[in-house]
Amino acid sequence: MNELTAFNEQRAEIYWWLSSLLSAELTTEQLEQYGSFEVRTFLSNLAETPELSDSVNALIEKLNAVQGREDAQLELSADFCDAFLGSDKSSALPYASMYLDKSGLLNAKPAQDMREWLTKYNIAQKAEFNEPADHIAIELDFLGNLIVMTNQQVSEDEFEAYMSAQLTFINEQLLSWTPRFNEICIERDKFGFYAAVTGLLVTFLKLDVKFLAGE
């Protein structure tokens, strides 16, 4: 494994991690893991990247605050529901269609576009996650898989084509709406844990675009 493929694996893991945070409420066991040495080391290492430092430290600060809540898991689950599962007037709905399609309806063209990406690369949506294809967690899970597929390409031309596809996907399917999604999450998530997650997501996406574009 060379340095680039190893870095790609790290990128995929980060996208899968962010996908898991935005797909469902954290269980008690998962929340306890966020206090572990392993996870805290992962976050500390991530914060060593200067462009990510502020966003990661904001998330660490919220994690520390979560640990101090009386019923941490239940309260954080309520925060998740308030942040993402309400109406478009009260929550930051995690679907691209809500931000990119004038109809304001779920399962609009952005969802169709996402289904086409899934089909093109033969990546299946997880059967147990029954959400429209343009849910943020599905898009991030897809991106992680696309990065891993990139590492599996044999020729340099194929490898570069897959790297280019990642750049196109991030620009068209994610950065086209996640900054606004993050802004609304900041407004609606009173405790701020999930706003810290979406803030880190947008920061990481912008940094990743620079990497993929060779800047």
UniProtKB/Swiss-Prot annotation:
It comes from the Bacteria. Pfam families: Nitrate_red_del. Its main location: cytoplasm. GO terms for biological process: protein complex oligomerization; protein folding. SUPFAM superfamilies: TorD-like. InterPro entries: Chaperone_TorD, DMSO/NO3_reduct_chaperone, HscB_C_sf, TorD-like_sf, TorD/DmsD_chaperones. The keyword Glycosyltransferase does not apply. Gene3D superfamilies: 1.20.120.1820, HscB, C-terminal domain. Belongs to the TorD/DmsD family. TorD subfamily. Involved in the biogenesis of TorA. Acts on TorA before the insertion of the molybdenum cofactor and, as a result, probably favors a conformation of the apoenzyme that is competent for acquiring the cofactor. HAMAP family: TorD (MF_01150). This is Chaperone protein TorD. It comes from Aliivibrio fischeri (strain ATCC 700601 / ES114) (Vibrio fischeri).
